[in-house]
From Swiss-Prot:
Binding site for Ca(2+) 1: 201, 285, 389, 392
Distribution of this protein across tissues and organs: Expressed by the venom gland.
Family label: Belongs to the venom metalloproteinase (M12B) family. P-III subfamily. P-IIIb sub-subfamily.
Glycosylation sites: 372
Cofactor note: Binds 1 zinc ion per subunit.
GO molecular function, one term: metal ion binding
Extra information: The metalloproteinase domain which is released from the cleavage of the disintegrin bothropasin may be unstable. The disintegrin domain belongs to the long disintegrin subfamily.
Protein name: Zinc metalloproteinase-disintegrin-like brevilysin H6
Cysteine disulfide partners in this protein: 309-389, 349-373, 351-356, 373-378, 405-424, 405-434, 416-429, 416-434, 418-424, 428-451, 442-448, 447-473, 460-480, 467-492, 467-499, 492-504, 499-504, 511-526, 511-561, 526-572, 539-549, 549-556, 556-598, 561-572, 592-603, 598-603
């Protein structure tokens, strides 16, 4: 644990106000000028790092004093963070720059519970903060006086294009009635507090158009991406999700895909490139493309729904339509929200007095809040689909930055970390020291009850199927033992299926999940349609092309069900959606014949499948 530094920045009352000025965010018609003056109080003999872990800024907005507390965003970069660009002859150049002493911060405004703030302190102060419900931006003025900064409201930026901007994702709300019911649920503080964090390892990609737009200045593009990621991390922490930047890629020598104004084509091409190229050389969970191209119509973003962790479809595309990082961050958070199973908000969804991130149309003032509907949908997706790539919390030894008590991450030298003393809700943990209180054996974990290890034999993870036995506490640890499955290929459900990654996938259950009761696996003749290789009947996709099923593989393509429900008589019912082509396909590991299972669109011998 390191000594927390207190840095006071005195900002003199602005000596003048401007009526209009051109800043990085655009033409601002009303702003205040402030002069930061930094005073550092360090313990005697302490070595001052380039960028402190904690800082405090004091200044005035509209003549009223504001105290801004900032803490370095320790979760911004991953241990294996890398940057890739290309030489003029197309050679890939990848580096692993040091990122421990970076200059990107989150924080809070004193005495304003609803305040949000995301600031970079690389060359002066740049970013945004919300104060008393209004969004302000701050950035250095490019004057000979390098200490001058502009502070202005978002509403005072002159917008060149006032036309409404939209996400390209469409959906049928008539078919999503459960969301309305879910939006009416109220989570208790205890439920929210103990929701486990998830970790999204993100790669940001900039196309050749971004390079041209920024006059070939790769450092400028990278700085922009750092600021976008810092904002994303701040936005998603309220969803109990940490977004860590694991890589930046810039297509400096030319686009690696065909980037067109058609969002369907561009998203599909980017998804295929991510699967076949990016994922083979860089471990990550999600990739977002930032492009300078102007998408057709009012669309500025597009993504696949419920696709997080999918090797191909865990992607989104965002148009660089605004110079304001906060605006682009909200659009990117919106598209990543689709990847996390979140749909557009409806009239019954609420963010209190604010607009919501998942509105189909981007609001006049960008919101950094997800609605109650979004929270429910996101965690329904996480709990129901279990996207495994975002489950693993980085080990304390994997975090390259110095441990900081109070950041809610268990790091080297800490026994617990429940946040700041003001926010800590853990009765077992001393928030000031990140050590367990006297008499406590544990402060967290599925095998920790009232600060003591649970008794040996206490069930800590229930069985999800006969292929996934329950786990029990050992009595010697607060952690539940590792989740162990029966061996893949072991017969299950009275030989109707074979175990696969802890489940027993059979077609009847998959039909039930799609259509409900009274729907069963269809006759074999229905599956012959998978030989067509058309938009719905195929076994797999290769380089964007749908490959028809071989005769022996027809039961490993599109799923066909027989609907016997009242008023229905459909012997070959199937599900297909342009938004999610994979939904409705027979799941991997499903039995496709005696001693055979589906694997990569083929019906193979279970003895050799795994």
């Amino acid at each position: 644990m390191i000594q927390v530094l207190l840095v006071t920045i005195c900002l003199a009352a602005f000596p003048y106000q401007g009526s209009s000025i051109i800043l990085e965010s655009g033409n601002v018609n009303d702003y205040e000028v402030v002069y930061p003056r930094k005073v550092t109080a360090l313990p005697k003999g302490a070595v001052q790092p380039k960028y402190e872990d904690a800082m405090q800024y004091e200044f005035k907005v509209n003549g009223e004093p504001v105290v801004l507390h900032l803490g370095k965003n320790k979760q911004l970069f991953s241990k294996d963070y890398s940057e890739t660009h290309y030489s003029p002859d197309g050679r890939e150049i990848t580096t692993n720059p040091p990122v421990e002493d970076h200059c990107y911060y989150h924080g809070r405004i004193e005495n304003d519970a609803d305040s949000t703030r995301s600031i970079s302190a690389c060359n002066g102060l740049k970013g945004h903060f919300k104060l008393q419900g209004e969004t302000y931006l701050i950035e250095p003025l490019k004057l000979s006086d390098s200490e001058a900064h502009a502070v202005y409201k978002y509403e005072n930026i002159l917008k060149e294009d006032e036309a409404p901007k939209m996400c390209g994702v469409t959906q049928n709300w008539e078919s999503y009635e459960p969301i309305k019911k879910a939006s009416q649920l109220n989570l208790t503080p205890e439920q929210q507090r103990y929701n486990p964090f998830r970790f999204v390892e993100l790669v940001l990609v900039a196309d050749k158009g971004m390079v041209t737009k920024n006059n070939g200045d790769l450092n400028k593009i990278k700085t922009r991406m750092y600021e976008l990621a810092n904002n994303l991390n701040d936005i998603y922490r309220y969803m109990y999700i940490h977004v860590a930047l694991v890589g930046v890629e810039i297509w400096s020598d030319g686009d690696k895909i065909t980037v067109t104004p058609n969002v369907d084509d561009t998203l599909s091409s980017f998804a295929e490139w991510r699967k076949t190229h990016l994922l083979t050389r860089k471990k990550h969970d999600n990739a977002q493309l930032l492009t300078a191209i102007d998408f057709n119509g009012p669309t500025i973003g597009y993504a696949y729904i419920a696709s997080m962790c999918h090797p191909k479809r865990s992607v989104g595309i965002v148009q660089d339509y605004s110079p304001i990082n906060l605006v682009l961050s909200v659009v990117m958070a919106h598209e990543m929200g689709h990847n996390l199973g979140i749909h557009h908000d409806h009239s019954y969804c609420s963010c209190g007095d604010y607009a919501c991130i998942m509105g189909a149309t981007i609001s006049h003032e960008p919101s950094t809040f997800f609605s109650n509907c979004s929270y429910i949908q996101c965690w329904d997706f996480i709990m129901d689909h279990n996207p495994e790539c975002i489950v693993n919390e980085p080990l304390g030894t994997d975090i390259v930055s110095p441990p900081v008590c109070g950041n809610e991450l268990l790091e080297v030298g800490e026994e617990c970390d429940c946040g700041t003393p003001e926010n800590c809700q853990n009765e077992c943990c001393d928030a000031a020291t990140c050590k367990l209180k006297s008499g406590s054996q544990c402060g967290h974990g599925d095998c920790c009850e009232q600060c003591k290890f649970s008794k040996s034999g206490t069930e800590c993870r229930e069985s999800m199927s006969e292929c996934d036995p329950a786990e029990h506490c050992t009595g010697q640890s607060s952690e539940c033992p590792a989740d162990v499955f029966h061996k893949n290929g072991q017969p299950c459900l009275h030989n109707y299926g074979y175990c696969y990654n802890g489940n027993c996938p059979i077609m009847y259950h998959q039909c039930y999940a799609l259509w409900g009761a009274d729907v069963y696996e269809a006759e074999d003749s229905c599956f012959e349609s998978n030989k067509k290789g058309n938009y719905y009947g195929y076994c797999r996709k290769e380089n964007g092309k749908k490959i028809p099923c071989a005769p022996e593989d027809v039961k490993c393509g599109r799923l066909y069900c027989k609907d016997n429900s009242p008023g229905q008589n459909n012997p070959c019912k199937m599900f297909y959606s342009n938004e999610d082509e994979h939904k409705g396909m027979v799941l991997p590991g499903t039995k496709c014949g005696d001693g055979k299972v589906c694997s990569n669109g083929h019906c193979v011998d279970v003895a050799t499948a795994y």
